[in-house]
Each structure stands twice: as C-alpha cells, then as structure tokens.
Curated annotation (Swiss-Prot):
Entry keyword annotation includes Transport: yes
Annotated function: Produces ATP from ADP in the presence of a proton gradient across the membrane. The catalytic sites are hosted primarily by the beta subunits.
InterPro entries reported in the protein's UniProt record: AAA+_ATPase, ATP-synt_VA_C, ATP_synth_F1_bsu, ATPase_a/bsu_AS, ATPase_alpha/beta_chains, ATPase_F1/V1/A1_a/bsu_N, ATPase_F1/V1/A1_a/bsu_N_sf, ATPase_F1/V1/A1_a/bsu_nucl-bd
Entry protein name: ATP synthase subunit beta
Gene behind this protein: atpD
Superkingdom of the organism of origin: Bacteria
GO molecular function terms noted in the UniProt entry: ATP binding; ATP hydrolysis activity; proton-transporting ATP synthase activity, rotational mechanism
Protein's UniProt keywords contain Membrane: yes
Subunit architecture: F-type ATPases have 2 components, CF(1) - the catalytic core - and CF(0) - the membrane proton channel. CF(1) has five subunits: alpha(3), beta(3), gamma(1), delta(1), epsilon(1). CF(0) has three main subunits: a(1), b(2) and c(9-12). The alpha and beta chains form an alternating ring which encloses part of the gamma chain. CF(1) is attached to CF(0) by a central stalk formed by the gamma and epsilon chains, while a peripheral stalk is formed by the delta and b chains.
NCBIfam families, per database record: atpD
Residues reported in the UniProt entry to bind ATP: 182-189
UniProtKB keywords: ATP synthesis, ATP-binding, Cell inner membrane, Cell membrane, CF(1), Hydrogen ion transport, Ion transport, Membrane, Nucleotide-binding, Translocase, Transport
Localization per record: Cell inner membrane
UniProt similarity note: Belongs to the ATPase alpha/beta chains family.
C-alpha cells in the first residue's frame, strides 16, 4: 500500500517545478508592487527590509523562492521604519541575505470547500498526499475574527460517543469544545481515534483533522485507516467526508504554530455553508509549544515556566473562533498534552477556561490496566445538568462519583489496616467501587489490533441502566473480573457465567 508522503518528501518531489513557483512569485510582485530583501536569518525567524512606504501589515504573508520551493513568511513585528521580522512556514536552509521577497498583500490564504475532503494539506494549503493539485479556487485567510455574539447559538444538546465513562460522567456538548488531557502515553491519541471512529463515521456531516506537532507515523496511519474504512476516497473525490491538515513534529515552529488555524479555517468554511462539522486537533499543546519557540526568537521576554507572554491571547484568539453559529456548528475535540502530568502547567491550565467538557486521562488508572484511562472524578462537563441530561442520568452519575470518592477516601485505611478493619457498609461500598472502576473500561475498535478484543459501542440508555444496577447493589453477587473490558451490563452477566463455568 502506498504511503502518504511526508511534507518533506513532497517538498523534495516538487523541485522540478521551480520555474512555475518563480512565476507565481512574479505575479504576486506585479499585484502588490512591494518587494523587499532578506537582511537576517536566525533559525525560523527572517528579517526583511522594504522600500519606504511599502511596509507590509502585521500577519501579511510574504513569499520568496528558496531553491525552487515556495517559502511563505508571516509578518510578526515591525522593526523601525522599513524592516519587518517574519516567521517562516518551512525550513529556512538555503536562504541568503539580499534575496528578493514579495508581499502578497494579505494573510496566508488556504483552499477551502468540498474539494479539500479526502486530501492532506500543509499549513499554507499545499497538498502533500501526492494526489495532484487541489481543484478549487475558493480560498480563505487563516486569520479571522471570532463570530459576533448575536450570531452564536446557545442550544444545549448531548453528543453521544458510545464510550461509557464519557457519556455517563462528563458528556460532550454538540457544537461544544472538548479537551482530552493527559501526560505522555496514557492514551490521548487512541481516544481521539476512537472518537473519530464512533462519531465521525456515524455523523453525516464533514470532519476536519488537524495534526499539530505530533508523529508523522500516526498521521499516515490515520490517512490509510480513513481510506480503508470508507470515510475517505484516495485523492479525494465523491464520498470523502474528512479533510486532513498536517504540520507534524518535523516541521519548523512557524508551521506548527499556524497549522491549527489552517484546519480551523477549513472547518469554519463548512460551518458557514450550514454544515455540522467535527474538528479534531492532536495536539493543542504543540500549538502553544511552537508559539513559545518563536516567541524567544522574536525577542519577547518569557513568562511563567518559559512560555510566551502572549499565551492566553494566542489561545483565546483560536478558541473563540471554534463556536456554533446560527448557520452551522463546529464540535471540537482537542487532545492536550500535560507536561510531567502537571495540570497546573500554564499551557493546559489556559486551555481549561475555554472548554465545555474536560476528559482527564490518569496514569494511576492506566497502571491498573483500565482503558480508556479516564479519571471519573477529575473529568467535568457543563452538560451534566438535570435540565439537560435528565434526572435519572444525573442521579446515577452523581451516585457513581460519590461511591468512587468514598473508595478513594478509604484507600489509606485499607493500605495500612487492611479490608477487615472496615465496617460492613464500607466493605460493600469498596466492592461496588472496584466493580464500577472495571465497568468504566471498554474495548475500543481502534485498539482491536493490540487487545485482540472486538470494539464495543454502548448506547447511552444501556450505560445508565448498567451503572444504576451497580450502585443499587443488583450485581453485588458477580465477581469483579466479570466487569472488566465489556460493553453493556448484559455482557458482564454473560462473562460472569463463563467465569463460573471455567472455575467449576
């Protein structure tokens, strides 16, 4: 099976097309008339001097030819009267002082619309899947204003994911912003892939996936999985449902700091056309990290923990654009890496304020072998309200949380004195909590290759019914092992019968 090209390979493949690139740069020069020259290159930051009166605006895209490849620079600062400091969207190797740079007269603009479905683009909207050019003339600037308050929709509706722990304890809002928080290796990407599998496939509308500073291998795997599962057709075409925008780990910080905006711009276009869009981002932390990398090169004084002083502004400008309007909705699922498992780190802490639901993945739960390793006490959602989810759902979820909280409070006593020292009531609560913990695990479709167990999608009614029975003591007679890695409560009962038969 042919592998999707990495942006670097595609750049190398494009070298023969040098004359075409140079010609496009000339047309830009003719359009705006402003031509500058490179005066200094420091890593991803390039200084360009212009003639007096021709200074480009902040966030304008500048173009130059770097050994046959189109290199886009984005204006970040004005230095004095006729010089600008820019951030490069690709490698600056090979750039020389005195080289001509053309002002395009506007921000970076990327292709949008149905023609992007089934294709992989990079930060500047160039296709990187070796399937030919994008057949669309519709373009949209990656820097946009957030929708006005009067245009925003306030309707509250649940997005059912088929994942028990999410649907019961921290349900997602349709048209809301969802954050998946976790340290390294606790399952953020697997969970986001499962959500793509469960939600994007069942969802009739379009999806946009932005790969921000993550592994190229994972992006490649996702591309091929989407083709194999029928979500996309190779090279786009009729029937494709998802657009992919990648700026992976090997890209310079300029690309990683802007690729989330490119993906969001594609999603905004679908929303404004009246679609309900799913927007997946893996990983928002890399967006912040890339901003931090270029911030120091731009000469800004670092803030707390070495982050850029503009951290909250950068995050706010992007997150405020991800919203549901009266035309259509964007439901956003964002994986957020938590450095050293510290949720108080400025990068994840800044994200919390913008989210409707937070799913916190915990290393202590992953260590028990319970996957998805969602922390049932740390995860929150504004949707968990009896007015939205209904009285029964609300009551069951709160009972589950109080049982787990009680078990957590008793763990020190159990560790020191043992289970025998607990009261009968506490013993029952601990036994139920341990069953609930195991019943919150679930085999995933995307993890079938690792676990060998077929994936399970559980309806919300079945989830509520199962946990209601557990907290009310209806399944106290079943062994703990019966609840591990099953879907509905009926499967747990069946598993208990099998275990009893094997033991007999």
């Amino acid at each position: 099976m042919a592998k999707a090209a990495t942006p670097k390979e595609t750049a190398a493949a494009k070298k023969p097309a040098a004359p075409k690139k140079a010609a496009s740069a000339k047309t830009v020069v003719a359009a705006t008339g402003a031509v500058g020259r490179v005066t200094q290159v420091i890593g991803a930051v390039v200084d360009v001097a212009f003639e007096e009166g021709q200074l480009p605006q902040i966030l304008n895209a500048l173009e130059t030819d770097n050994n046959g490849n189109r290199l886009v620079l984005e204006v970040a600062q004005h230095l004095g009267e006729n010089s600008v400091r820019t951030i490069a969207m690709d490698s600056t190797e090979g750039l020389v002082r005195g080289q001509k740079v053309a002002d395009t007269g506007g921000p970076i603009a990327v292709p949008v619309g149905k023609e992007t479905l089934g294709r992989i683009m990079n930060v500047i909207g160039e296709p990187v899947d070796e399937a030919g050019p994008l057949k669309t003339s519709a373009r949209r600037a990656i820097h946009q204003e957030a929708p006005a308050y009067v245009d925003q929709s306030t309707e509250a509706q649940i997005l059912v994911t088929g994942i028990k722990v999410v649907d019961l304890l921290a349900p997602y809002a349709k048209g809301g912003k969802i954050g998946l928080f976790g340290g390294a290796g606790v399952g953020k990407t697997v969970l986001i892939m499962e959500l793509i599998n469960n939600v994007a496939k069942a969802h009739g509308g379009y999806s946009v996936f932005a790969g921000v500073g993550e592994r190229t291998r994972e992006g490649n795997d996702l591309y091929h999985e989407m083709i194999e599962s029928g979500v996309n057709k190779h090279g786009g075409g009729e029937g494709s449902k998802a657009a992919l925008v990648y700026g992976q780990m090997n890209e310079p910080p300029g690309a990683r700091a802007r690729v989330a905006l490119t993906g969001l711009t594609v999603a905004e276009q679908f929303r404004d056309e009246g679609q309900d869009v799913l927007f997946f981002v893996d990983n928002i932390f890399r967006f912040t990290q890339a901003g931090s990398e270029v911030s120091a090169l731009l000469g800004r004084i670092p803030s707390a923990v070495g982050y850029q002083p503009t951290l909250a502004t950068d995050m706010g400008q992007m997150q405020e654009r991800i919203t549901t309007t009266t035309k259509g909705s964007i439901t956003s699922v964002q994986a957020i890496y938590v450095p050293a498992d510290d949720l108080t780190d400025p990068a994840p802490a800044t994200s919390f304020a913008h989210l409707d639901a937070t799913t916190v993945l915990s290393r202590s739960i992953a260590e028990k072998g319970i996957y998805p390793a969602v922390d049932p006490l740390d995860s929150t959602s504004r949707m968990l309200d009896p007015m939205i989810v209904g009285e029964e759902h609300y009551e069951v979820s709160r009972k589950v949380q109080s049982t787990l909280q009680r078990y957590k409070a008793l763990q020190d006593i159990i560790a020191i004195l043992g289970m025998d020292e607990l009261s009968e009531e506490d013993k029952i609560a601990v036994a139920r909590a341990r069953k609930i913990e195991r019943f919150l695990s679930q085999p995933f479709f995307v993890a079938e290759v690792f676990t060998g167990s077929p994936g399970k999608l559980v309806a919300l009614e079945d989830t509520i019914k199962g946990f209601k029975g557990l907290v009310n003591g209806e399944y106290d007679h079943l062994p703990e092992a019966a609840f591990y890695m099953v879907g509905s409560i009926e499967e747990a009962v069946e598993k208990a019968k099998k275990l009893a038969a094997e033991a007999a």
